[in-house]
From Swiss-Prot:
Entry binding sites for Mn(2+): N177, E243
Protein name, per record: 3-octaprenyl-4-hydroxybenzoate carboxy-lyase
E.C. no: 4.1.1.98
Gene Ontology molecular functions: 3-octaprenyl-4-hydroxybenzoate carboxy-lyase activity; metal ion binding
Pfam entry (one): UbiD
The organism's place on the tree of life at top rank: Bacteria
Cofactors demanded by this protein: prenylated FMN; Mn(2+)
Length: 514
């Protein structure tokens, strides 16, 4: 599916019967989450709440939810016709990350053409004026309370801005970083920026604080960017390629960007809403001193304004612990005329991140095969919170092979550094079929011999089951057939029906009355 921007994408979804306009009044507090959750679990359409109510009053704009509520809509957003076609996207990314040596002149020319398209033809196009800056709120007009930000769960500490595309640039970076990090409103012009320490935005901020201590760090947050740009921010794009370039490849046209009004950052020109501002040094007169609740640990000494974030209901199905993160002070809000507020919720799977994981699973397979060519298939079950459990099938070639694959998966892509459980099966097992996976585990595994336990590894900070926040264990399960050296016993012989008998039964089947 080809489209220009979010509005064009929504128009095409509506023609396909994949967008439902909700005209009844619906509150952004809890009601929207319950409706979206029921529709997502039923595999239903994207939802446009045209009569949203916010803070017991009509909202100034409609709210879009469940945009990526099915794998097919994720594929359409990435410019593919179906989920299976995302393997081609993965092949493209694999080639850009680690190009293989050409097999001949024709192959060499094809690779040059691909690199030219990625690195030059699809470089973002800067425009002088843009729809995202048709309306500007500055100074006292900045009021995040006017945006219909959802309160998703009863125990949430505040509303939650969940689909913000955060744009940063480190002092030594050649390109901008785009990432999606949740943000907690603190007041009319402040948000807590919850990014984990290894994410691109946090790394850019760390480098800035080291290179320019005591200087404000510019940030822009785009809401309602086109789907390719949003999805580019959650895809393992190689460091040589910007998310804007990757979005252009997906969309088939260069991403148009415009310079932010208050910084040198480039923002998506067609975004519905853009927040501009800075992370402020702690001694800036606009900064607010951190309030430390009784019994809580004080904030880390970053030299910048910090605040205690959470708790919020999260993709784990639980409320997360509170933690300290930097505060984003919003200097201005720009937007299109009649903007659409793009929102989502996270909760016990399936939710929108889980659906994204199912679709992006197809992108990961070629990337992993480039590093571990013995991989046949790879699956992240959505009920495993998108990334905490992986099942991989391999062409086993030697004793100990499964263990090599486990450690390879934990190391190849940053996306899998938090994967707690890896199950390795042979190529005759479909990793997407739990009946086959469980059969392999219960017949090909010895719990002591075939279980790998690793202590003190990086773990998602939202994982309260780990003994220490951010640090915990990993488990690998070798459910492959065992080779000499792995067992001294005679291995089981699998049962298979005689092929001649199967053909005879096929021939008589229609006469059996079954």
């Amino acid at each position: 599916m080809k489209y220009r921007d979010l509005r064009d994408f929504l128009a095409q979804l509506e023609r396909q019967g994949e967008l439902k306009r909700i005209t009844a009044p619906v509150s952004t507090r809890l009601e929207m989450t319950e409706i979206a959750d029921r529709v997502l679990r039923a595999g239903g359409p994207a939802l446009l709440f045209e009569n949203a109510r916010h803070n017991d009053a009509p909202a100034d704009m409609p709210v879009l939810a469940n945009l990526f509520g099915t794998p097919r809509r994720v594929a359409w957003g990435m410019g593919a016709d179906d989920v299976g076609a995302l393997r081609e996207t993965g092949e493209l990314l694999a080639s850009l990350r680690e190009p293989e040596a050409p097999k001949g002149l024709r192959d060499a020319l094809a690779k040059v053409s691909m690199l030219k398209a990625a690195l030059w033809d699809m470089s973002p196009k800067t425009v002088r004026s843009a729809a995202c800056q048709e309306i500007v709120w500055e100074g006292a007009d900045v009021d995040l309370g006017r945006l219909p930000i959802q309160t998703c769960w009863p125990g949430d500490v505040a509303p939650l801005l969940a689909w913000g595309l955060v744009i940063t640039r480190g002092p030594n970076a050649r390109r901008q970083n785009l990432g999606i990090y949740r943000q907690q409103p603190l007041g009319p012009n402040k948000l807590i920026m919850r990014w984990l320490s290894h994410r691109g935005g946090a790394l850019d901020f760390r480098d800035h604080a080291q290179a320019h201590p005591g200087k404000p760090f510019p940030i822009a947050v785009a809401l309602g960017a086109d789907p390719a740009t949003i999805l580019g921010a959650v895809t393992p794009v190689p460091d040589t390629l910007s998310e804007y370039q990757f979005a252009g490849l997906l969309r088939g046209s260069r991403t148009e960007v415009v310079k932010a009004l208050g910084s040198d950052l480039s923002v998506p020109a067609s975004a519905e809403i853009v927040l501009e501002g800075h992370l402020l040094p702690a001694d800036d007169p606009r900064a607010v001193a951190a309030a430390v609740p009784e019994g809580a640990n004080p904030p880390p000494a970053t030299g910048y304004e910090m605040a205690l974030e959470g708790p919020y209901g999260d993709h784990t199905g639980y409320y997360n612990e509170q933690d300290w993160f930097p505060v984003f002070t919003v200097d201005r809000i720009t937007m299109r005329r009649n903007p659409i507020y793009h929102s989502t919720y996270t909760g016990k799977p399936p939710d929108e991140p889980a659906v994204l994981g199912v679709a992006l699973n197809e992108v990961f397979v070629p990337l992993l095969r480039r590093q571990l060519p013995e991989i046949v298939d790879f699956y992240l079950p959505p009920e495993g919170c998108s990334y905490r459990l992986a099942v991989v099938s391999i062409r086993k070639q030697y004793a100990g092979h499964a263990k090599r694959v486990m450690f390879g998966l934990w190391s190849v892509l940053r996306q899998f550094m938090y994967t707690k459980f890896i199950v390795v099966v042979d190529e005759d097992i479909d990793p997407r079929d739990w009946t086959e996976v469980v059969w392999a585990m219960t017949t090909r595994m010895d719990p002591v011999r075939d279980t790998v336990l690793v202590e003190n590894t990086p773990i998602d900070y939202l994982d309260f089951a780990s003994p220490v926040s951010g640090l915990g264990g990993k488990m690998g399960l070798d459910a492959t057939n065992k080779w000499p050296g792995e067992t001294s016993r005679e291995w089981g012989t699998p049962i298979h029906m005689d092929e001649a008998v199967k053909r005879r039964v096929d021939a008589m089947w229609d006469t059996l009355g079954l």
